[in-house]
Amino acid sequence: MTSKVAQTRSEQALSLLRSGYLFASRVRRRAGVSADSGCPVRMPLLGKQTVLVRGEEGVKLFYDTSRVQRDGAMPEVVKGPLFGSGAVHGLDGEAHRVRKNQLADMAYEDERVAEYKPLVAEELAALAQRWQGGDNVYDSTAIAFGRASFRWAGIPWDTQEMDRWAHRMSRLLDTFGRPATQAVAWADRIALDRRFAKLIRDVRSGAVAAPEDSVLAHMAELVDEHGALVDEKTAGIELQNLTRPNVAVARFAAFAATALVEHPEWIERIRAASRAQGGTLLDVPEAVAFAQEVRRVYPFVPVLPAEATVDTEVQGCPVHKGQRILLDILGTNTDPASWDRAATFDPERFMGVADAEAITTFIPQGGADVRTGHRCPGEKIAVTSLSAAVVALCRPEVQLPSDQDDLTFSWTHMLTRPATGVRVRSTR
């Protein structure tokens, strides 16, 4: 562990916008340490003193609720369209604990995940026909994951409406946080909030019958820390937060397709493992390991902010009350101090790992305990979706691309993905 404190004195907001996923490594170099260094870096960001952290010690600080809070840490320009106002992501203390437990009951428990599995398998199996005329992995899996999620939640929409809202959720992720497209992101956020609030209102009034014990039924009964029913907009936002993150897994599905092209030895291995299990798309260990490695190596969220609630320190670096803490997500997932051959794509590292969430520095969807920390409660569902998509992409009739355009993506564009969506075709 290092006790050195590095710093850069210049404002870094513009650098974050321009550098994207390269921001953290560039800041470290400006501060006089190596890009791979685990040394905390002090810097001004959006006019506020900020400490950039990574690795095991950074994770321990960032998710320590006795020292850190989320409320007020993320700029509204990012938080508003992405998460929605009043969502669990910005709550702390008892309010967060109560809300998070209700969401985890819906998405994290094994019986809820089991309800989701046949739905996503059915939707992904249907992609073979859609891919016959040519399509791309990103758009097609966003629709498949969206349909499976809405059906799982008990939302009574027809296929056309499911596709419409899955598309808007997907587009929101492509447009938020950037000046040129922020208006589109806000338009989608407003439309989504209105539609989901109406859905909650209709369930509460009896105009729509939610299936018994469904996610929709429980979200219509969502309460705050005082036991009071939350307003319909907030309940609708949390219903989105149980479905939209799974649509976002399409980004990882596109990256998985590029990884399969670049590591073709895994295609036959995954195909054979699925065949040995009767041709299933679900729970194929090799595909799960491949999916986890995709989530570790490929970029999704670059950094996350929090705020210190007390004077504290990390690795000898003082962190004062009110200062921002910025956790380097990608840098932690690929931290050379935590991972053997950290920069190498190797799904083998996850073979036989029963609980990847127990790995402190594996945080593609947040860290710490799912019920008390800020780890996404839908992580098991996300891994189910991605691993099933990996098996689908390994089917003999599926033709993956060889064009370099399908394998490249921007490291400075947030949120990034292969620009083509990764073109795919099926011969069946």
Give residue spans per PLM region.
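Cytochrome P450
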Residues: M1-Q7, G32-V53, E57-K60, D64-R428
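N- or domain-start disorder-to-order transition segments that initiate the globular core
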Residues: E11-A31
